[in-house]
Amino acid sequence: MNKSNLRRKVAELFIVRASGFNLDSQRQYPNLEASKENLKRLLEEGVGGVIFLGGTIKELEIRCQIVKKWAAQPLLLCADIEEGVGQRFYGGTHFVPPMGIAQIYKKDNSLGISIAEKIGYFTGKEAKKIGLNLLLAPVCDINNNSNNPVINLRAWGEDPETVKDLTCAYQRGISRSNMLTCAKHFPGHGNSEVDSHLDLPEIKNNLSQLERFELIPFKSLINQGVNSVMVGHLFFPNIDPFYPATLSKRLVNDLLRIKFKYDGLVVTDALLMKAISKKYSSANAAVMAFDAGIDLLLMPEDIDEAIDSLTDAFYSEKISLERLHISIERRKKQLDLIGNENDLEKEELRHEDVKNKFLVDAYRFSNSIIKNSIFVRGESTIKAKVNDINLIQIDNFDQVSNKFFPALNLPKAVGFKNLIIHPLGISPWQKTNKRFLDLGRFGNSKILVQLFVRGKPFIGLDYHNEHWVEAIKNLEIKERLSGIIIYGCPYLYDKIKKNIHESIPLAYSPSQIEE
């Protein structure tokens, strides 16, 4: 095989990031997302996958059709959709974060499992309708560290049994919709306090500890036939003292491939994440990951450099050509499983009346889940007097982007004045004591506190801090507290619940109903 043809074969194993928006000028992260011209070139040169972020569901449907025409072979078209299509693409259904389903599971195991499977089915069907074929989900990490800055609400629970039951149910639902699935982040990102987008997390667990805890959901999903496993950028010095999991033969080849007998696709987490790119070049990371047993290389910082380097490794026989053929065959096998993309099921969803009914059904189901996952302490009613304040802490303007969202609309209907605080806005904290609100800014009004709190990549848990617990306690002492509603993180809800009198109205919801 000449080097040019070899490079095209190697390129099949790479996944490039692109925007779901149609225009280059609309890209949210132009330094991370390939331009239209560059994306077309890469696909014509053989790159085998695209991961999308942003845009509307209609735009993405068009984008998927376009990139398939540019490509030299069938593509893996994927997205990090963990909470429904609407999490990444406007106009899609946005479901409760997985941790919210775990709260339902605690009350009723069967109901939690049923809901998880239906979420998987609706998500897979909706994703298929717009042209995707691989969902980078479910998250199989067990969030047994409440200070985890990046997994947090993305996890399906805090213990192996809960996560195993719910991820298996979710994966069954996606598979029913004829979509490919991905268990991540092997061998477990739950017990970390570092965001791998920013640095390399170090986890002290040895192999026997992992097998008794973190690996249980992965084993179950592998036995259930999950199509791919994503390896996390995680350092386990008691298993491999030299390399992070992504580049570790001990973890990828010896544990996942040989011990677990896994013969599906193994994919890296994004190689441009600082956990890898701080220390390894795109060229070295690609070669080392593949040599460790990886099949698919996701989002290297410099994709051309990575493809060239891996091509050289095969051409010089540093890595055998047999390994290349095995990975290409694994990729083909998974694409063959989902069959003809123009099957009857997808064709049915092209009819607008069927499509609209499906979206309405998914939307109603999403809202019904939220209603099932709301916790209210006691039967207290929050009342407002003139000029009382609805203080909403957000970290994302999408949380209050619709004036009809309950967090805004319901308090306003009973007399509260909405006041939104955001990290980019004016600080509400005292200059001398950052743990207390500057009450002088709020007059003599009583305050309803609503907090949107969740761990997020690159941001972490900035608002899951003790200062909110203390600030709310101070409001209670000064008799300025009307009530508290926590959205997202159940850990903050638990702390506040223990710290304030039971007469204070208190509620928790993993999300808000969009109606």
Segments (PLM) and residue ranges:
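Phosphate/pyrophosphate-binding betaalpha-module
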Residues: 166-183, 187, 196, 208-228
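Short, well-ordered coil/turn segments that N-cap beta-strands
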Residues: 10-12, 46-48, 72-75, 132-133, ...
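Enzymes and membrane/adaptor proteins characterized by extended Gly/Ser/Thr/Asp/Glu-rich
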Residues: 19-33, 39-166, 185, 190-204, ...
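Catalytic PLP-binding core of fold-type I/II PLP enzymes
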Residues: 250-266, 270
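Anion (oxyanion) recognition and catalysis
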Residues: 128, 175, 222-223, 290, ...
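Preference for extracellular/luminal or secreted protein segments
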Residues: 1-40, 45-46, 258, 282-515
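Alpha-helical scaffolding segments of alpha/beta enzyme cores, especially the outer helices
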Residues: 59-69, 122-125, 161-173, 216, ...
